[in-house]
């Protein structure tokens, strides 16, 4: 990488393949959008898809992993049980937590995942296959259930500053439902230390037609994954 940034258009996701460590998976493919080959040291970011009936065998990572469900429904198995997640749901898996993904539905299950620090190719992507007991019947995510405190859900209504009164919210008002609004930009935190994340964060950003984030930098890496709409960005004086 000749610059300190990388931009990849959505059609490149067609290059998705099955990672070497997931050779025993069925119906699984992943597009590594950001990783070690790009010069990243803090970040691994990719989009995943699990076909109907597909299964990703139980494994753990030596990095922290957060996810955001883009489409379909799937089941996440951990030692704490099985959790059914769908579009808009998100969560965080701490370092060394055994987990398994499966799709028991009839449509593709798609999610984006953030990994920190960057998985290393020379160490098998810092991922290890491990046994995991059958998790039983999957329960639906309830953000008020302390058993699922490392997970959450976000919808378009959560990003609307005019729909934040208690009678319009499905959950109790708290900092978990708070919005940060400035210069035409709306920000809602998803994964942070409240979910026990220590190595990364994940948040949703919405720009109004005249929204602007001025020139700035960070002492860390940052990845943007566009869900809808268009925006103009300038990185290292290059405009996209």
Which residues are covered by each model-predicted region?
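Short, low-complexity cationic-aromatic patches
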Residues: 38-39, 58-62, 118, 193-198, ...
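A short beta-strand-loop-beta hairpin characteristic of the jelly-roll/cupin
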Residues: 55-87, 217-240
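Structured core of small recognition/catalytic domains
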Residues: 176-178, 183-240
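A short, N-terminal "cap"/entry segment at the start of jelly-roll beta-barrel domains
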Residues: 1-42, 126-199
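Conserved hydrophobic/aromatic beta-strand scaffold that supports enzyme active sites
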Residues: 45-49, 66, 82, 90-92, ...
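Conserved short histidine dyad/triad with adjacent acidic residue
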Residues: 27-34, 46-61, 184-187, 203-218
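Ligand-binding loop in jelly-roll beta-barrel domains
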Residues: 40, 75, 86-89, 95-123, ...
């Amino acid at each position: 990488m000749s610059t300190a940034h990388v931009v990849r258009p959505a059609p490149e996701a067609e290059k998705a393949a099955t990672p070497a460590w997931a050779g025993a998976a069925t119906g699984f493919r992943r597009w590594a959008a950001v990783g070690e080959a790009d010069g990243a040291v803090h970040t691994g970011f990719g989009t995943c898809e699990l076909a109907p009936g597909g299964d990703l065998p139980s494994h753990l990572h030596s990095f922290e992993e957060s996810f955001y469900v883009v489409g379909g429904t799937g089941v996440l198995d951990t030692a704490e049980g099985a959790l059914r997640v769908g579009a808009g749901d998100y969560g965080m898996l701490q370092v060394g937590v055994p987990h398994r993904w499966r799709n028991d539905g009839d449509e593709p299950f798609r999610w984006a995942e953030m990994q920190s620090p960057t998985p290393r190719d020379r160490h098998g992507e810092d991922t290890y296959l491990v046994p995991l007991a059958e998790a039983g019947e999957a329960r639906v995510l309830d953000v008020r259930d302390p058993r699922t405190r490392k997970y959450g859900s976000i919808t378009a209504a959560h990003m609307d500053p005019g729909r934040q009164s208690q009678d319009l919210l499905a959950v109790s008002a708290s900092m978990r439902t708070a919005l940060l609004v400035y210069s035409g930009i709306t920000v809602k935190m998803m994964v942070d230390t409240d979910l026990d994340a220590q190595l990364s964060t994940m948040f949703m950003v919405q720009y109004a037609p005249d929204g602007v984030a001025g020139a700035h930098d960070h002492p860390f890496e940052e990845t943007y994954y566009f869900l809808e709409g268009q925006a103009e960005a300038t990185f290292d004086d290059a405009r996209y």
